[in-house]
From Swiss-Prot:
Subunit structure as annotated in this protein's UniProt entry: F-type ATPases have 2 components, CF(1) - the catalytic core - and CF(0) - the membrane proton channel. CF(1) has five subunits: alpha(3), beta(3), gamma(1), delta(1), epsilon(1). CF(0) has four main subunits: a, b, b' and c.
Keywords: ATP synthesis, CF(1), Chloroplast, Hydrogen ion transport, Ion transport, Membrane, Plastid, Thylakoid, Transit peptide, Transport
Similarity comment: family membership: Belongs to the ATPase gamma chain family.
UniProt GO molecular function: proton-transporting ATP synthase activity, rotational mechanism
InterPro entries named in the record: ATP_synth_F1_ATPase_gsu (IPR035968), ATP_synth_F1_gsu (IPR000131), ATP_synth_F1_gsu_CS (IPR023632)
Superkingdom of the source species: Eukaryota
CDD domains to which the protein is assigned, alphabetical: F1-ATPase_gamma
Protein name from the UniProt record: ATP synthase gamma chain, chloroplastic
Organism name: Phaeodactylum tricornutum
Active site: C145
Amino acid sequence: MRSFCIAALLAVASAFTTQPTSFTVKTANVGERASGVFPEQSSAHRTRKATIVMDGKANAIRDRITSVKNTRKITMAMKLVRAAPKVRRAQDAVLATRPFSETLQSVFGGLIQRLGGESVDLPLLTEREVKKVTLLVITGDRGLCGGYNSFMIKKAEARFNELKKNGVEADLILVGKKGIAYFERRGFPIRKKYETGQNPTAKQALAIAEEVSSTFLSGESDAVELLYTKFVSLIASSPSIRTLVPFSASDITAKGDEVFQLTSESGQFGVERTELDVAAPQEFPNDMIFEQDPIQIVNAILPLYLNGQILRTLQESVASELAARMQSMQSASDNAGSLAKQLNLEYNRARQAAVTQELLEIISGASALD
């Protein structure tokens, strides 16, 4: 009986090891017990190898734990290695275009003041009765970014239906693979499609700006509305809509820009937003003679301003998408950590059940031999 008690203790001890434990128990046969000769004293004995064998469920849990931990490593890497640097690049791109926008705003303001109350012909500032609207919708090219794409698509679809309900015709200019795929499948009228990727360029913005201005100036649309995701913070974004053309002179000269800056402290990312002052109108002396008519200069500046606004919007949308992806990867990592803890508890319970079952079998075997 002593040998079986030793075996039982070994089985209990093996429950606290990380791997299944094998041990050898030398037990006396019935004849040896009857004669009072034990295995330690006789060469006639048999060996029984006892191993705590995990059942299929426990093995499946162990494999799942490994899979969850590997997934968590991937999501953390996507957040730290891929998303964060791209947000910084988008931030730097916005800051780099700011001087150009400020100069255009300043020159435009100065020319408007120089023209004073004159009746001027500025086609991109001319308002007319709205019978048809073109929606410029900016979405992302990829998924794994939470509700970034779905929120923008829902807002665009709601605005389209609102215009139709009010008797206003509407069509779409789409930027981004996700929006293109969604609206194409549902048969929406699409005027033009663009894919700008994660690093929008001035050339891509120029192509979109030319399409927008030609659509408005040709009279095919009476207004173009811009729908994009405004970058608020790393954990929040705001689907926004505003009229892109016709421009309002007061909006151009009276609104300052907001810039964002990605910060990090104690391993945590954050965003600082700064509202910039309006660029002061450039002063042109009354005796200054322009080689070209000021109206022609303004008409030349407005397309450049439109191009700059679209480029800035594309860059801000990319920053919003990347921030949403960072947050999505952080949530996925947190969920993976919680799931791994839960699975570890289940695995330990399964191991405990296997140890208990093995112990009961040993004790039952000992009782049967007595």
